Amino acid sequence: APVLLTAAVLLLAWWMAAGGLPAFARACEVFLLAVGAGFVVILLFGIFRLDWSLTLLWTREELAQVPAGALSTAGTMAVGGYALFLLGDVRPEAGGADGMLRRLALLFALLAGAVLLVLGQLGSALAAQVDRPFLQMVSGLGFEGAFQRLEELVSALWVLGDVALLGLLLLCLGRLLAWLLDRPVGKGKSWLLTGAVFLLGLPAALGDHPLAGTWVPFGNLAVVGLLVLTLLGRGEEKKLEKSEKRG
């Protein structure tokens, strides 16, 4: 079942990415609204069940784990930096930088809220032992009646996030391959990319993913850092070329 679900999600991501970046971006905006609304529901259900004493880090051992956790989180979030591969397909807008900063601030606020819910209901010790502490936390939420269980809602929202992430990855890989081959990537090569992503994702789908929480986040940071440095260097080269032409 996990393999079939992975294949289905990846096929949906390929179908969305095949429509081009504009259509993919519009679909992701709809996904964002759905995920945001779902998270607000989870927050409203969970905020009243927090044990605030569990949210404070009292011991030196707990405080010592904060830097490693922050670095791992940064590596996971760095996957969004792969969108830099798509800069050539977009145009800058007035106030775009401010809008990006506001969205990043909202994203980190939501992430902090999720961490607060997990710690306030599970505690740091139990959260470190379970595989998916957020889903474990959600399993204890709900009221009698229509909202008795929220796992189904969270699972559906999780799939939307996976589709968006895989679609972004396929678009970025397609752009990188087109740059390497110096020509557009057709549907045949896009199928090869999708198949390669599926094969690489099989260990995680089968539950054998020892590198997912360690090397993958750090790999994201390394790739995005190298990409940013390359773009900065290219920008300096263009400035130098302009100054030489003026001179």
Predicted regions and their residues:
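Small-residue-rich transmembrane alpha-helices that serve as helix-helix interface/gating elements
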Residues: 194-196, 212-230
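Membrane-interface interhelical connector segments
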Residues: 121-151
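Hydrophobic alpha-helical segments and their helix-loop junctions in multi-pass secondary transporters
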Residues: 17, 34-59, 74, 119, ...
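Extracellular/periplasmic helix-loop-helix junctions in multi-pass membrane proteins
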Residues: 181-187, 201-220
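Selective recognition of specific alpha-helical transmembrane segments in multi-pass small-molecule
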Residues: 12-14, 33-47, 102-127, 189-204
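Membrane-water interface regions at transmembrane-helix termini and the short interhelical loops
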Residues: 9-31, 89-94, 207-211, 234
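Alpha-helical transmembrane segments of helical membrane proteins, especially in multi-pass transport
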Residues: 107-122, 148-197
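Hydrophobic, membrane-embedded alpha-helices of multi-pass small-molecule transporters
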Residues: 5-6, 18, 43-49, 58-110, ...
